[in-house]
Amino acid sequence: KDPYLRPYEEVMTGFLGAGGWSDGKLTYSTQIGGQLSKYVGEEKAMELMKQVVDNFSRFHPHPEQIILSNPTEEPEFIKPHFGLRLFPVWHIGTDYLHEIGKSWYDYLVNKGVKFIWETKVTSINFDDQKVFIEKEGSYRSYDTLIFGVGKSGIDFTSDIMEQYDLPTEEK
């Protein structure tokens, strides 16, 4: 659902997905949380992460409240008990995530992005640039397809990967 119609109980679906209900922190390191640098290199990965932070700032109602914490050493009282890895973290603010999402959504819609909600796509023909819409029983063409299914689309993603024999790798 679009961010204006998404009820609180739908924590895993809709615009922002589960991240919209997170604590509003963005880890700012390639050493944790993903494998982006493996595919684009360290420098490009950091550049892309900076773009993400910039976009959160751009759509934040109070961007001056976004802060970066960059711990350099574990506190003495923790050292004997935990082997923590310390990384820079941008604190966006939990209470602002939905406002940010709405502003971001409005921006995209005003730029001509068309969101199609609550529509089950059951197959994709990448060669002909068409998706099959289950309830319509027909294919719909697209110019650009952003495949952002989130957690609710894991099974569909697996089916597409198998159908197109896409390479996979262990995490």
Task: Put a short name on every predicted segment.
Residues 1-33, 38, 67-171:
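Residues forming the flavin
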Residues 40, 44, 48-59:
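Conserved catalytic/binding loops enriched for acidic/polar residues
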Residues 59-60, 76:
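Alpha/propeptide regions of enzymes that mature by internal proteolysis
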Residues 60-67:
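Compact, glycine/acidic-enriched structural inserts
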